[in-house]
């Protein structure tokens, strides 16, 4: 159960299940679907580790890509994700529910079919909301609290044993080259690719280095 509660599907199902129950109890209730916070939770499960809000008051957002963190203007790419990827997620869920409903027996499974219809109706309303400016603004506001990292600025580029290159991160402590990860908290980069030193490929460079070191530290 603990693992399930950390999945996107778990939170998405909650947004359409709790509200569909309300609709069944009160058919005249023109619900808009789940609350802004509930939908923001789905977004957080989708993108935790890829986005961070470093300043809730001023709306400062960062995105992890290409092995390091980049600051993004007002979280524009996250807002676009609400309009595109998150809507697609709900649309796929609608298709899944409709296909399941078709497979049920119209008579013996009538209650189950009605329950699915209620979920589909709620999901459709959420899909509509995810394309509305005001709704997206409210979801972004709720997302600030969820994605907020109060120690983000303190951790940025604070590890002296890590060096970010265009194609990965050199970890001097572990003596390895690896993909960057969000927990590295790197923003600065050499902007050049790292290549392992090989005698065949870097023969002349190795010779120059040895020559330089011998002159710098001559053997007596």
Task: Identify the residue ranges that each predicted region occupies.
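P-loop NTPase catalytic core of nucleic-acid-dependent motor ATPases
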Residues: 50-77, 155-158, 162-163, 169-220
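Generic detection of long, well-ordered alpha-helical segments
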Residues: 29, 33-34, 75-83, 113, ...
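Noncatalytic partner-interaction/assembly domains of nucleic-acid and motor enzyme complexes
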Residues: 32-99
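Intrinsically disordered, low-complexity coil segments
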Residues: 54-57, 74-80, 96-122, 141-151, ...
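Extended, Lys/Arg-enriched charged tracts that mediate electrostatic binding to polyanionic substrates
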Residues: 25-42, 120-169
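A broad, structural surface signal
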Residues: 41, 80, 84-91, 141, ...
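A structural signal for alpha-helix termini and helix-coil/disorder junctions
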Residues: 46-49, 88, 92, 145, ...
